[in-house]
């Protein structure tokens, strides 16, 4: 989500006594907002409590636990993005990075680019293609252009996103000539 906030709903507790149900509330902080594994750097906002509906007789006693001194890690995983593109029919199944016109579903409207060689469609014919009948080949995500909304490719993945690609009809040109004969045909 492009923040260093680790929401309580994203954190799992381990090492509690078997059968005891605990929950966390509020949020903690990581040292980075980018993809990776981090130590949770600030636990001051996290509160341990008995799980909703638990009672002292069920053994869920939050007062018996502390986060101080434990091991606290948090992983930020890559986010799936969607790509789409269009080109005119050219008799090949090739999809070039330059043919990808939209990369969507990024966080905070971050901008990414495409790079690499070619992907392919299952046919060279005019049609709409999707993840099922395309291959990424060597197409990869690349960092977006420098600026306020530059996205880092390392934070995103094409896996799990949609990949839509359309081959449109090729526009033909025509010309002709004839000797003047006063006819319109």
Feature locations, PLM:
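Short loop/turn motifs that initiate or flank beta-strands
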Residues: 2-185
């Amino acid at each position: 989500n492009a923040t260093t906030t680790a929401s309580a709903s994203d954190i799992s507790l381990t090492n509690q006594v078997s059968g005891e149900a605990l929950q966390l509330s509020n949020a903690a902080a990581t040292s980075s907002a980018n993809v990776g594994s981090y130590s949770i750097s600030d636990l001051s906002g996290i509160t341990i409590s008995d799980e909703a509906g638990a009672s002292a007789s069920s053994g869920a006693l939050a007062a018996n636990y502390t986060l101080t001194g434990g091991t606290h890690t948090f992983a930020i995983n890559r986010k799936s993005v969607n790509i789409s593109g269009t080109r005119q029919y050219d008799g090949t199944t090739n999809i070039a990075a330059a043919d990808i016109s939209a990369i969507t579903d990024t966080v905070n409207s971050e901008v990414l680019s495409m790079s690499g060689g070619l992907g392919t469609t299952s046919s060279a014919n005019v049609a709409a293609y999707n993840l099922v009948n395309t291959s990424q080949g060597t197409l990869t995500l690349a960092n977006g252009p420098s600026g306020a909304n530059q996205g880092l490719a390392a934070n995103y993945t094409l896996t799990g996103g949609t990949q839509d690609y359309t081959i449109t009809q090729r526009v033909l040109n025509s010309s002709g000539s004839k000797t003047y004969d006063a006819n319109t045909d």
